[in-house]
Design a protein with these regions (language model features):
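Extracellular mucin-like PTS segments
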Residues: 237-271
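Extracellular/luminal immunoglobulin-like beta-sandwich modules
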Residues: 98-100, 104-127, 167, 208-210, ...
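Short, structured motif recognition centered on aromatic/hydrophobic residues
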Residues: 46, 76-79, 90-94, 147, ...
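N-terminal Sec-dependent signal peptide, specifically the hydrophobic helical h-region
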Residues: 1-20, 102, 123, 127-132, ...
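Solvent-exposed loop/turn motifs of extracellular immunoglobulin-like beta-sandwich domains
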Residues: 3, 23-30, 39-41, 85-89, ...
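Amphipathic alpha-helical interaction motifs in eukaryotic regulatory proteins
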Residues: 34, 47, 95-98, 108, ...
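N-terminal V-set
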Residues: 37-76, 154-186
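Extended, solvent-exposed segments with strong compositional bias
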Residues: 80-84, 189-194
Length: 271
């Protein structure tokens, strides 16, 4: 399973705040921390271990920025860091999680001649049986791709989304749905969340070769945590590559359709 969480936290020098994060084996987390504008040019880093006023355990750096390395991705193994200086936030992406990654981490800003500002992140990585870790889909150009992703019941009330990955950014393009049994559309992507069934349905219509990519199904809590649950690999082929005409893919209704009907009840066949 995949996960990826987003945390928005204000770090104050000399003050330790703590959050708990659940990740899924095979997934990842995105941790987003805010900082005071006066620390825009300071080094940002992410480390594993305890960090208290009286350090009894070393916090080993996993990834860090250089000064003036703002608005650029920094990559190191399974980690990526991006410092959005205009918004005074930086994000840490932690991919390909395993249960061995469970532990204590720190999201921090390096402050010279003073206590660094940091937030303790307690990460617990588990394996969930409800959902697939990865699925592969294919469609002919001009057709539609239907995505179905299950999620843990504990996330039923959360916002659901499908993100398209671009390089280090697991969520370069996002379409989300905030209500149960209502379609939400953005561009060629439409989403439908059935919270009773814990099932997220997505439809990408009129696909082209440009839609061949890695996508992620996930959830976002009201605290801003983003959890990437299932990786979806989509391959779009030319019509000439298919051995026989494929059946027409169903399409979703507009987002204004009634919320009482299921996705399949509201789909119509494209001509």
């Amino acid at each position: 399973m995949k996960i990826i969480w987003t945390f928005t936290l204000l770090m104050i020098p000399g003050v330790v705040s703590s959050i708990s994060v659940t990740g899924y084996s095979g997934g990842g987390v995105i941790i987003t921390c805010t900082y005071d504008r006066k620390y825009t040019d300071n080094t940002k880093y992410f480390c594993r271990g305890q960090k208290t006023f009286i350090q009894t355990e070393q916090c080993s750096d996993l990834i860090k920025t250089d000064k003036k390395n703002d608005n650029k991705w920094v990559n190191s193994g399974r980690f990526s860091l991006f410092d959005y200086t205009r918004a005074t936030v930086f994000t840490v992406t932690f991919r390909d999680l395993s249960e061995q990654d469970s532990g204590t981490y720190q999201c921090a800003v390096d402050i010279s001649l003073s206590e660094d500002s940091y937030t303790e992140v307690n990460l617990k990585v588990v394996t969930a049986d409800c959902c697939e870790k990865s699925i592969s889909l294919s469609a002919a150009a001009g057709g539609s791709v239907n995505i179905s992703c299950r999620y843990p019941q504990s996330h039923s009330a959360d916002v659901k989304f499908v993100c398209r990955r671009s390089g280090s950014d697991l969520c370069a393009e996002e379409t989300s749905v905030k209500e149960s049994r209502r379609w939400s559309a953005e561009g060629q992507m439409q989403l439908y969340d059935d919270r009773e069934q814990q099932l997220l349905t997505g439809i990408i219509s009129h696909v082209t070769q440009q839609h061949s990519a890695e996508y992620w199904c996930g959830v976002q809590s009201d605290q801003g945590h983003k959890s990437f649950i299932t990786r979806v690999l989509i391959r779009v082929t030319d019509v000439s590559e298919t051995s026989s005409p494929s059946s027409s893919s169903p399409s979703s209704p507009s987002s204004s359709s009634s919320s009482a009907e299921s996705p399949l009840q509201r789909m119509c066949v494209r001509n």
